[in-house]
Curated annotation (Swiss-Prot):
Lineage, opening ranks: Eukaryota, Viridiplantae, Streptophyta, Embryophyta, Tracheophyta
Protein name, as recorded: 1-aminocyclopropane-1-carboxylate synthase
Region (Disordered): 443-467, 497-517
Function: Catalyzes the formation of 1-aminocyclopropane-1-carboxylate, a direct precursor of ethylene in higher plants.
Enzyme class: lyase
Catalytic activity: S-adenosyl-L-methionine = 1-aminocyclopropane-1-carboxylate + S-methyl-5'-thioadenosine + H(+)
Pathway: Alkene biosynthesis; ethylene biosynthesis via S-adenosyl-L-methionine; ethylene from S-adenosyl-L-methionine: step 1/2
Subunit text: Homodimer.
Modification N6-(pyridoxal phosphate)lysine occurs at: K277
EC number: 4.4.1.14
Stored PANTHER family: 1-AMINOCYCLOPROPANE-1-CARBOXYLATE SYNTHASE 6, BIFUNCTIONAL ASPARTATE AMINOTRANSFERASE AND GLUTAMATE/ASPARTATE-PREPHENATE AMINOTRANSFERASE-RELATED
Statement: the UniProt record of this protein carries the keyword Transport: no
One annotated GO molecular function: pyridoxal phosphate binding
Source species: Dianthus caryophyllus
Length: 517
């Protein structure tokens, strides 16, 4: 019946409705499902799954709450603000409230240490992640492609590919140079795409990086700008984590670099931004497109009418971000709290022999568990991941979901919980590692424990030096005990074998940006 139903659905429904491009049926969602079934609570479910797969910033809610209590007029749901109800409830210009766009532009400048001035008239608002999708609708047609350095945020496959029909082509970044983008890898990916008759429309980067928690330096940004200018393709910089940089080197926006490169065609440069990470407000669904291209701004603004930020949200955010004293205090305090949380988490991991890529930004660490794999394969990584979910009872994200070329890396979020919960998670990790060292209680021997020597490279980065230490460890051949059945990758969101597939590829081109303004 299931097979027949699938055929019937494909006959009467669209390709989007019948493909699995959203990706929620992929095995990488199993960790989220485990958490949803059995969420940790300090008193009601202390043995539940701790959510460390969610990049959410909960460290400064008290500052926002305090501001709201002092400024009740910023909400129409209070006695002080209710007189604004009618003005906010009626239809608004889909360009956005002028005070909202001005406040966001000003905040974006402060988030970049006021080295850049942003023009409110170039800001297009959109509901959350639809901003990135809207931008790609403006820049590319179904079947076109964007190059993207891997590892990269896996939901880009959903946010950028699913409905637009645009392909993402990853090019590999390696731990040998701390996952830095190289011109050689970029050029190779570009040439390979051309050989396959794929039209490359641009490059997408996240700065600071998700999942690495690192920032792009000025030389790399200059290289990217020079590259896209020479090829006449676009550069999209997702700067959603701009104010989460808590240690040196400082964040450098592409908007700052382009000022010193007058020969670069600014029509090719676009910035994505949001308040979800910097302000910890993903539920408010505030997504921002900032483009230097007039046609993109006008087209994206028309398209944004399908997914506007609510007027009530705009009203409150405008008041919040217009308070210079609050913004100044918030940015300083947020960076300090992120620094202390990151420092505590990574130092405790180091005590039990777990290293992380030396990051200085974002809400997570890129944790190195390669030494726990007896074989450097995706299959072994996923088996370890399932043990972490089902036995350690922590949901983390495996590197293969980010298209990382080196099995054994995991993204672990540390800012979406209180200190006590973080310490519970650390105790669980500590116990797991200690048990494994003492009696291998989380593993089952598959052969007589013949000694095997494996060379593991652990890379540690500082702001000025990179030290590579080769550590030899003897391990028996072991098989991780599983609670879930192993499944094959399915077509869709995060399979490394389906990156170039698109439900829209047969569709005719839809040149939205060519429409008369």
């Amino acid at each position: 019946m299931g097979s027949y139903k699938g055929v019937y659905d494909r006959e009467i429904l669209s390709k989007i409705a019948t493909n699995d491009g959203h990706g929620e049926n992929l095995e990488y969602f199993d960790g989220w499902k485990a958490y949803d079934r059995d969420p940790y609570h300090s008193t009601k479910n202390s043995n539940g799954v701790i959510q460390m797969g969610l990049a959410e910033n909960q460290l400064c809610f008290d500052l926002v709450t305090e501001w709201l209590l002092k400024n009740p007029q910023a909400s129409i749901c209070t006695n002080e603000g209710v007189n604004k109800f009618m003005d906010i409830a009626i239809f608004q210009d889909y360009h956005g409230l002028p005070e909202f766009r001005s406040a966001v532009a000003k905040f974006m400048g402060k988030a970049r240490d006021e080295k850049v001035i942003f023009n409110p008239d170039r800001i297009v608002m959109s509901g959350g992640a639809s901003a990135s999708e809207t931008l790609l609708f403006c820049l590319a047609n179904p079947g076109d492609a964007f190059l993207i350095p891997s590892p990269y945020y896996p939901a880009f496959n959903r946010d950028l590919r699913w409905r637009t029909g645009v392909n993402l082509i990853p090019f590999t970044c390696s731990s040998s140079n701390n996952f830095k983008i190289t011109k050689e890898a970029l050029q190779s990916a570009y040439e390979d795409a051309l050989k396959k008759n794929i039209k490359v429309k641009g490059i997408i980067v996240t700065n600071p990086s998700n999942p690495l928690g690192t920032v792009l330096d000025k030389d790399t940004l200059k290289m990217l700008l020079t590259f896209v200018n020479a090829k006449n393709i676009h550069l999209v910089c997702d700067e959603i984590y701009a104010t989460t940089v808590f240690n040196s080197p400082s964040f450098i926006s592409v908007a700052e670099v382009i000022k010193d490169m007058p020969h670069v065609n600014q029509d090719l440069v676009h910035i994505l931004y949001s308040l979800s990470k910097d302000m910890g407000m993903p539920g408010f669904r505030v997504g921002i497109i900032y483009s230097y291209n007039d046609r993109v701004v006008s087209t994206a603004r028309r398209m944004s009418s399908f997914g506007l930020v609510s007027s009530q949200t705009q009203f409150m955010i405008a008041a919040l971000l217009s308070d210079d004293d609050f913004v100044r205090r918030f940015l300083v305090e947020s960076r300090d709290r992120l620094f202390r949380r990151h420092q505590h988490f990574t130092s405790e991991l180091a005590k039990i022999g777990i290293g992380c890529l030396q990051g200085n930004a974002a809400l997570f660490v890129w944790m190195d568990l390669r030494h726990l794999l007896d074989e450097a394969t995706v299959e072994r990584e996923l088996k370890l991941w399932r043990v972490i979910i089902n036995e350690v009872k922590i949901n983390v994200s495996p590197g293969s979901s980010f298209l990382c070329s080196e099995p054994g890396w995991f993204r672990v979020c540390f800012a979406n919980m209180d200190n006590a919960t973080l310490d519970v998670a650390l105790n669980r990790i500590r116990s797991f590692v200690t048990r494994g060292r003492v009696d291998n209680s989380t593993m089952t021997t598959t052969s007589a424990r013949a000694a095997a020597t494996t060379t593991t490279t652990t890379t540690t980065t500082t702001t000025t030096t990179t030290t590579t230490t080769t550590i030899k460890k003897k391990r028996g051949q072991m098989e991780l005990r599983l609670s879930f059945n192993n499944r094959r990758f399915e077509d869709g969101l995060m399979s490394p074998h389906s990156i170039l597939l698109s439900p829209h590829s047969p569709m005719p081109q839809s040149p939205l940006v060519k429409a008369r303004t």
